[in-house]
């Protein structure tokens, strides 16, 4: 009979090590960054803790999840293989040879990355049979719909590490999920400071700005300010073939003029 083990992978904060020993009975944490390219940052590493050996800690994770951001993992594989995989998927490659760190242990990133509808998920899960976390996307945060999420991987019992391990390459669906995370984070920061009816409305304005050829955060933010000031105005049919700042000026001028025209003929 397969024996399952349960683990907590907790995102780092300054007080985490101390709290672990306050709440844990036998924390004995593994530092995720050890034996990886991030070993130089080991002091700020997420910590992996055996949940069955620390029932009070597991209860705290379930009862007060905002105080313990991280993942709950269930696996039929030994500790060494779980750690091997968790460390392996830390460093990822994008199109070309660009490398990055995948902060999958963050509930925010997990809500985008592991929720992407991709046939590659079993590869990313590897030895993990069940994955749970509390949180959600930036949109969920704005709409007050954060909660617990659980995903399963029926292929975990048959998983074996590759003999010649290569860096994981991000597929298009996962790349889009991470790009959406960045876009929603940018929008949430703007939306939380502005009197917009809904996050969804603000998202539509952001998408309009992108289609208009606005790319930089300053231009997109200025466009959002203009749309917020003139929410009922229509966009011009097409942007002029000029640089970004001229497109932004053309757009904001059109929005202001559209309001004046409506007032004139009302």
Q: What residues fall within each predicted segment?
A:
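Conserved beta-strand segments of the P-loop GTPase G domain that flank and frequently precede/overlap
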Residues: 8-11, 49-50, 72-75, 103-104
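Short, charge-rich binding segments
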Residues: 62-64, 92-95
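Signature for HUH/AEP ssDNA processing cores
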Residues: 50, 54-57, 61-77
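A contiguous, surface-oriented mixed alpha/beta subdomain in the mid-to-C-terminal portion of proteins
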Residues: 2-4, 19-35, 43, 48-49, ...
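Short, hydrophobic/proline-enriched secondary-structure or compact coil segments at domain edges
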Residues: 1-15
